[in-house]
Regions:
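Conserved N-terminal alpha-helix of the aminotransferase class I/II PLP-enzyme fold
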Residues: 30-79, 83-84, 100-107
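N-terminal glycine-rich, Lys/His-bearing helix-loop that initiates the first secondary-structure elements
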Residues: 1-42, 292
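Glycine-rich phosphate/pyrophosphate-binding loop
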Residues: 25-26, 34-54, 58-61, 331-356
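Conserved PLP-enzyme active-site core in the AAT-like
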Residues: 9, 67-268, 273, 284
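PLP-dependent enzyme catalytic core of the Aspartate aminotransferase-like
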Residues: 106, 115, 136, 248, ...
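Short loop segments at secondary-structure junctions
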Residues: 30-32, 210-215, 242, 301-305
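Conserved small-domain helix->loop->beta segment predominantly found in fold-type I
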Residues: 257-326, 343-349
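Positively charged, small/polar-rich N-terminal and surface patches that mediate targeting and assembly
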Residues: 2-4, 10-12, 271, 326, ...
Length: 379
């Protein structure tokens, strides 16, 4: 079954009671049983809910996985993965990852004895150097947020398997429309569903997908025990959003390319970060493991002036200055003071998140209007 067909049909069926083609919103906390232990598959909505269940099957299918689990946020999904570890276990992570991921690793889990290493994963030698018998997870973002670095998923899988570690890939930026990490050797795929999967800036949600039954059992145990689940209304909204994911991603990619190439021509801009450029250091890896280059772009200004960057993000009219990404509307952000503010200045600058870095989430509007907006802001 092709991607667009799966996005619309996987995991969902007409309601047996009414024939409703859309999955009903089962807005209930509990379920009546015919007798003790004699239920219809559902007992309590923290453990499982029919609307959420349909979404979990849908997301698993579009990621070419067997098991899906949805959570109250992307960070709750990350929380579930790290709770699979024990004190003394080690995690090797991308060094320019999302600030919220860095924060939960460093300020929540580090004090429980879990060791985190942050490295440039474009350099596989450095990753291999850090692996040891205590390495339990290799955590990958690709493309990375916000530097758009590309990590070779298949290469990371080989390294992880050598030491018996799990490879977890944050696939938020690419979505399964552009890449399916499980097919490249990943053990777990993570999403901030809030972004492209939901696609309409109206839901906070996270998801995990795996094809390993043992991992899935642990994932569901933690999901139920910790209780950071998503609700039926949000599940319904995401089921609806995913039905157009393939259509939206086509437009995000088209617009992203047009805007990246426009930014390259601006006299005010120093560097443009977008994996579709042949000059991108890992362009060939992106070409190999992705089916397109996405709608996320970052750029820096000549002179690296903070005030100038803040002025530009205020001058735009169509691009909205806001956190988040992946919605149908275009957003602009300043990572150093927004998404990556929780990362110490010296650490973020070492990974490229300098004061003038601006990140764009290119939406599905007409590209010409978006370019015109950027032109006037950069003038």
């Amino acid at each position: 079954m092709k991607f667009g067909t799966k996005a619309i049909h996987a995991g969902v069926h007409p309601d047996p009671a009414t024939g409703a083609i859309m999955t009903p919103i089962y807005q209930t906390s509990t379920y009546v049983q015919d007798g003790v232990g004699n239920h219809k598959g559902y007992e309590y909505s923290r453990t499982q809910n029919p609307t959420r269940h349909a979404l979990e099957k849908n997301i698993a299918a579009i990621e070419n996985g067997k098991y899906g689990a949805c959570f109250g946020s992307g960070l709750a999904a990350i929380d579930c993965v790290i709770k699979m570890l024990n004190p003394g276990d080690e995690v090797i992570s991308t060094n320019d990852l999302y600030g919220g991921s860095y924060r939960i690793f460093k300020t929540i889990f580090e004090k429980y004895g879990i060791v985190f290493h942050f490295v440039d994963m474009q350099n596989t030698t450095e990753v291999e150097r850090l692996t040891n018998e205590n390495t339990k997870i290799i955590w990958v973002e690709t493309p990375t947020n916000p530097m758009m670095n590309i990590i070779d998923i298949a290469a990371m899988s080989i390294i992880a398997k050598k030491v018996g570690a799990l490879l977890c890939v944050d696939n938020t930026f690419a979505t399964p429309y552009l890449q399916t990490p499980l097919d490249l050797g990943a053990d777990i795929v993570m999403h901030s569903v809030t972004k492209y999967l939901g696609g309409h800036s109206d839901v906070i949600m996270g998801a995990l997908v795996t094809s390993d039954e043992k991992i899935a059992n642990e994932m569901y145990r933690i999901q139920n025990s910790s209780g950071a689940v998503t609700g039926p209304m949000d599940s319904f909204l995401v089921l609806r959003g995913i039905k157009t994911l393939h259509l939206r991603m086509q437009r995000h990619c088209e617009n992203g390319e047009k805007i990246a190439r426009f930014l390259k021509t601006s006299a005010k801009i120093d560097k443009v970060y977008w994996p579709g450029f042949e000059s991108h250091p890992n362009h060939l890896v992106a070409k190999e493991q992705m089916r397109g280059f996405g709608g996320m772009i970052s750029f820096t200004l000549l002179g690296n002036n903070l005030d100038e960057a803040l002025e530009i993000v205020k001058k735009v009219k169509l691009f909205a200055l806001a956190e988040s990404l992946g919605g149908v509307e275009s957003l602009i952000g300043h990572p150093a003071t927004m998404t990556h503010a929780s990362i110490p200045k010296d650490v973020r600058e070492k990974s490229g998140v300098v004061d003038s870095l601006i990140r764009l989430s290119v939406g599905v509007e007409d590209a010409e209007d978006l370019i015109e907006d950027l032109q006037q802001a950069l003038a």
